């Protein structure tokens, strides 16, 4: 084989390193699942991003974690399928397209359903391209041959199958229920499309008169306009204040309708007066109470948020205008006796910004209890879904145990059309996979399904289900891991689990890895209103995908939120730069060595033995941490090994044989360096794929790409604990000498006498054998290693395991001058300690200052005391 060529520019340039590499990976088909029967399958389906625009940092974080998992599994020899895809995102996409039309002076109704959907498909194609290019920039190892979209024909078939099946089992029904209604977009919303904001409102206290004229009962509300639809007043059955009133009637002010006082355990006796007005058509809890007591449901609003005919004289008014008028009228009647300021959480539409109206509406629903029960039972078995961190299982189960009916219809055009038809004459409902034969007599339901309905089927619909003989379904389902944020455990994770159990009889994934949200440096949620959002593509442009990925993967503990920090991304770029420079130095000193020439059998230095031992330890630790999804700890383990052990120590020590004349020693060190660098690049590859591929391609290597290079294995025969212990002692000595130099302001270039005293013969022999390293790194003017060494009066000392270091100060510094300088420094630290102790003794300061300010002062006090004691110790040494 010809001499190995190295092509690494002197300076690390992330743009040059990353340019073209992704296309090269795709061309090599390294990310495509092979179906190889000799390999175990490993599957992840990507949480499909909405096809509405740019990916944000949360997506970058989520997909980086998945890429780290799948890259490692691929290297471990699994047949990996990481399936990409996108979500049609119903209301989010429709709102964007409608906004575009509005700018042209058009509405969707001007176009009609068919033309509008054509426009939306065009939008989808454009933005899907943007998303793919962002995935490419991040370096995600996706199998594009299996890319899916939630409105693909195959997935649409799965949606119809599930709808029809649940309908026939009586688990999907059409009926009245309270839903989140957006009066601007005029559609039902899922809970995740509702944003809650703290609003300064009012609590209105009213007295409803008893129908027999014997008194009144007090109630309070934040929405007085809904009183027009009240059909009862509820009290707790055990409330002694109201027991005598249960069953009596109240005369509803303004309306004049008589409504009953009922007993229900839902009522909180401690809150307000302990009596609650019940409006079953405008509040979800009231709706449930109404069902229990067979109360009528009176809707007082239209779909656009104006009052309807049941609102009598207020008909046609906007709901908030109606509120003002009703308040005036109730005050005039003496019914409203108190208005108090009240800050409360109010739901707003994520899309239109409108205040959400809990609204009684005829919609399609899924009965959730039977589906939820199967998911709850699964968690009591050995085959349960494992949540990482474990605490999120409680969150998941709590939601399942308190589940409500799921409203699945949406008054939109973009989405999966509900496969239900109504007979034009009889009103009969027909539900099936295909339209009725005599279609001219039927009209299809105009609504579409909630986006979460189709995404709940994502793990198996993408594999070809309902065709259970599909090769991908048989091989890659169930999937292995789902990676997602804690904010969609209810909306998505839980629904995938119960649909997976219902339709495949299997859990859709073994593990659910939960991460938090990305926040800004101050811990605030990123939002358009705060203007604190960060575009991951901008970060990649400035620092590279490798730096961003490493930061995202290591920046928080499992399940915790991540604070974005430009400084930390920059520090990661510096880490990449360090790797580049160290690797380039190593490669430039390989002497053109080829892979076939690598030979680890030669006589090794103590540094060689140590780095090979440390590499084995790192491989073992990193592999174990990966199994537990400990990305942060795994990244830090690699960082410490690369920065400290490899770059700061081993490469520096390797310069001795590399620059020496012994060709055999040179060859062994080159082989060790190449072996360690190769394995280190593989360990780091899942985190930083671009730079590791670039360096690995320049190393003597076997194989086409690092993406498919085998995962490093511990090789016990390369560990030498005794030599590693010797190396640790050398490092301790060198560090101690460097610390002494720093303390006495002596630069490394100035020689310093070093006497090492040891009574341990083994230590003495080891130090004598490795004397060259001490001479290279301590720069001694004189080096003595013995059981007895001179002990001058003026000297600095340090103790390491098995030896005492003595460094004479005579001639090194002007001792009198140094004593004067240190006395001045001691005076300074005494004053600082006195000042901070005075502050901490001040009761006023302790009572008024924020906790973190007090804590900072305590930290300063500790720091100043430590510095003072160090100066005292140095003075004592010099005055001996």
UniProtKB/Swiss-Prot annotation:
Top EC category: ligase
CC annotations in GO: cytosol
Record-linked PROSITE patterns: AA_TRNA_LIGASE_I
SUPFAM superfamilies: Anticodon-binding domain of a subclass of class I aminoacyl-tRNA synthetases, Nucleotidylyl transferase, tRNA-binding arm, ValRS/IleRS/LeuRS editing domain
GO-annotated molecular function: aminoacyl-tRNA deacylase activity; ATP binding; valine-tRNA ligase activity
Reported impact of residue 47 to G: Strong decrease in amino acid activation
Coiled-coil ranges (or none): 809-880
EC number: 6.1.1.9
Keywords: Aminoacyl-tRNA synthetase, ATP-binding, Coiled coil, Cytoplasm, Ligase, Nucleotide-binding, Protein biosynthesis
Ranges spanned by the short sequence motif 'HIGH' region, renumbered to the chain: 49-59
Short sequence motif named 'KMSKS' region, residue ranges: 525-529
Subcellular location: Cytoplasm
InterPro entries on file: aa-tRNA-synth_I_CS, aa-tRNA-synth_Ia, Anticodon_Ia_Val, M/V/L/I-tRNA-synth_anticd-bd, Rossmann-like_a/b/a_fold, tRNA-bd_arm, tRNAsynth_Ia_anticodon-bd, Val-tRNA_synth_C_sf
Function (record text): Catalyzes the attachment of valine to tRNA(Val). As ValRS can inadvertently accommodate and process structurally similar amino acids such as threonine, to avoid such errors, it has a 'posttransfer' editing activity that hydrolyzes mischarged Thr-tRNA(Val) in a tRNA-dependent manner.
Subunit relationships: Monomer.
Domain remarks in the Swiss-Prot or TrEMBL record: ValRS has two distinct active sites: one for aminoacylation and one for editing. The misactivated threonine is translocated from the active site to the editing site.
The protein, known as: Valine--tRNA ligase
Record organism: Geobacillus stearothermophilus
Gene: valS
